[in-house]
């Protein structure tokens, strides 16, 4: 049986990076494996679940929504036995899920506000991953929320400047200015490795929109830049 998965592979990376960062920044425990599997199953569920609101192929999307939800529940049981309070982070996601549903109903999934809602959901997943092992809510949990979120907002603006909004100069300048501000903020705060983490994104935001690249090329470059960002983020904060 072939899995029903969205072809937005970049979103998978966006869903996993904050979670893994939160786990590594905290004290990883065995139950994190089940929490990760449960979270990933929930993420996979979002594709068929949101498509239910389009009113087409309902049986197919109902089937896969149930399959992924069941998998999420099964994987989550050991994690919830370890720390059930992580559910609070899931409840905090619900308003942003409502935003996703709203834009899906309007057939406007590419709306920037919809993208931002998704990024905030991923940030909450990262916060939950950090909190999970020791029930710690401190300054570092804000790092988990803020640093990947800034990076992925920049990524979203850049991708729009390369693809659907290529002819809209506002997205190009928004992408460049946002990346530049992120780098400058960390330079001013003397967090130089964090500033360096945003430099590859800034370079590609300035340079690549002038080039004609295929969707695959854009995706591969983005994967490499995300990997560099993540490595430098770990070096700067672990």
UniProtKB/Swiss-Prot annotation:
Family under the similarity heading: To B.subtilis YwiC.
Signal peptide: none
Lineage: Bacteria, Pseudomonadati, Pseudomonadota, Gammaproteobacteria, Pasteurellales
A Pfam family of this chain: YwiC
Full protein name: Uncharacterized protein HI_1626
GO cellular component, one term: plasma membrane
Principal subcellular localisation of the protein: membrane
Membrane topology category: Multi-pass membrane protein
InterPro entries the record matches: YwiC
Transmembrane regions listed in the UniProt entry: 19-39, 64-84, 85-105, 112-132, 141-161, 176-196, 218-238
Keywords: Cell membrane, Membrane, Transmembrane, Transmembrane helix
Places the protein is found: Cell membrane
């Amino acid at each position: 049986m072939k899995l029903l998965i969205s072809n937005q592979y970049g979103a998978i990376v966006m869903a996993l990076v904050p979670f893994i960062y939160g786990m590594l920044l905290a004290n990883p425990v065995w139950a994190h494996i089940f929490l990760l599997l449960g979270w990933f199953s929930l993420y996979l569920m979002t594709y068929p679940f949101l498509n239910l609101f389009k009113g087409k192929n309902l049986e197919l999307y109902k089937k896969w929504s149930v399959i992924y939800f069941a998998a999420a529940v099964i994987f989550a049981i050991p994690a919830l036995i370890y720390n059930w309070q992580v559910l609070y982070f899931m409840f905090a996601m619900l308003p942003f899920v409502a935003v996703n549903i709203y834009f899906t109903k309007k057939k406007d999934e590419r709306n920037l506000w919809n993208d931002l809602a998704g990024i905030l959901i991923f940030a909450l997943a990262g916060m939950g991953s950090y909190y999970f092992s020791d029930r710690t809510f401190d300054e570092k949990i804000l790092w988990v929320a803020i640093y990947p979120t800034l990076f992925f907002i920049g990524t979203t603006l850049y991708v729009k400047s390369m693809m659907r909004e290529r002819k809209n100069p506002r997205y190009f300048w928004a992408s460049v200015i946002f990346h530049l501000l992120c780098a400058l903020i960390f330079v001013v705060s003397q967090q130089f490795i964090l500033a360096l983490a945003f430099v590859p994104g800034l370079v590609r935001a300035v340079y690549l929109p002038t080039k004609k690249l295929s969707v695959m090329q854009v995706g591969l470059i983005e994967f490499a830049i995300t990997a560099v960002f993540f490595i430098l983020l770990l070096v700067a904060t672990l």
